[in-house]
């Protein structure tokens, strides 16, 4: 199950009438890119306005875009145009290099309806924001702060209930081998804890909600004072400065929210 959130786009209401499809998860070579092209063409014969989302953390091997797959990373839109409209890059690749964002965005064609989203999957690891077990609360919450600051129009998470298969719903929950603890799992079967069949939310998904609400505060502030002022507020309060520089407790976030309330309540 994918969890995608359209929290930045001023035209997000239009997505209610569109279909978004992902044809291939993290393609690595030109053969896999050709699969995306073929599936995209086939989908358009049935749904002409479908929007194709492609996740990737490197450029395609075997291409002539650049000397290495890392250098080709920013050039991916040139390979997949017009077969992808939403280019979704891994935060792991960006690391702490926020300058890479400009390189990625520079290759996009907004006039063709192209967008840039980000995602986390396995990486990045501590101290950068992610949703693994064992990370602090603000580290979970900062995934949203990071995505907003970088300027994408959406965010994708690869899975929300991807624990190991079990024969009965009440079986002990086991995370998938080879993945960081909690990766791809944000809620649990209710039967594990009681007779209820209602899913049980994790603390992490509650923190994700808090991060999404923080985005709404920042968007409100932006609507009144402009995005640059909202970015300055995020940094001035110490809530979030970068992927390895953010608040370790919720005090600065409360200050940020309080300032938004004070200046926007009238």
Please tell me what each predicted stretch does.
Residues 38, 63-77, 94-108, 139-142:
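Alpha-helical scaffolding within the catalytic cores
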Residues 62, 110-142, 159:
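Active-site clefts of carbohydrate-active enzymes
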Residues 139, 151-163:
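Glycine-rich, aromatic-lined ligand/substrate-binding cores of catalytic
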Residues 2-71, 75-76, 152-153, 168-266:
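Catalytic domains of carbohydrate-active enzymes that cleave complex glycans
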Residues 76-124:
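Glycoside hydrolase catalytic-domain groove-lining segments
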Residues 8-9, 22-23, 89, 118, ...:
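Conserved beta-strand positions
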Residues 11-13, 59, 94, 123-124, ...:
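Short, solvent-exposed loop/turn segments at secondary-structure junctions
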């Amino acid at each position: 199950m994918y969890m995608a959130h359209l929290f930045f786009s001023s035209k997000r209401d239009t997505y209610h009438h569109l279909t978004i499809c992902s044809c291939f998860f993290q393609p690595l070579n030109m053969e896999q890119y050709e699969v995306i092209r073929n599936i995209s063409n086939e989908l358009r014969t049935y749904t002409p306005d479908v929007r194709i989302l492609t996740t990737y953390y490197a450029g395609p091997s075997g291409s002539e875009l650049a000397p290495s797959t890392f250098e080709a990373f920013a050039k991916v839109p040139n390979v997949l145009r017009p077969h992808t409209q939403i280019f979704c890059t891994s935060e792991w690749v960006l690391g702490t290099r926020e300058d890479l964002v400009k390189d990625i965005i520079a290759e996009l064609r907004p006039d063709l309806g192209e967008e840039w989203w980000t995602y986390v999957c396995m990486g990045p690891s501590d101290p950068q924001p992610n949703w693994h077990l064992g990370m602090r609360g603000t580290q979970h919450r900062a995934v949203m702060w990071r995505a907003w600051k970088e300027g994408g129009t959406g965010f994708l998470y690869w899975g929300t209930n991807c624990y190991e298969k079990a024969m009965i719903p009440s079986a002990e929950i086991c995370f998938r081998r080879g993945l960081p603890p909690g990766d791809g799992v944000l809620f649990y079967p209710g039967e594990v804890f009681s007779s209820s069949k209602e899913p049980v939310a994790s603390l992490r998904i509650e923190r994700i909600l808090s991060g999404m609400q923080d985005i709404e505060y920042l968007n409100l502030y932006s609507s009144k004072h402009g995005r640059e002022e909202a970015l300055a507020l995020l940094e001035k309060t110490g809530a979030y400065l970068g992927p390895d520089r953010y608040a370790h407790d919720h005090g600065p976030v409360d200050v940020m929210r309080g300032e938004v309330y004070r200046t926007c309540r009238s």
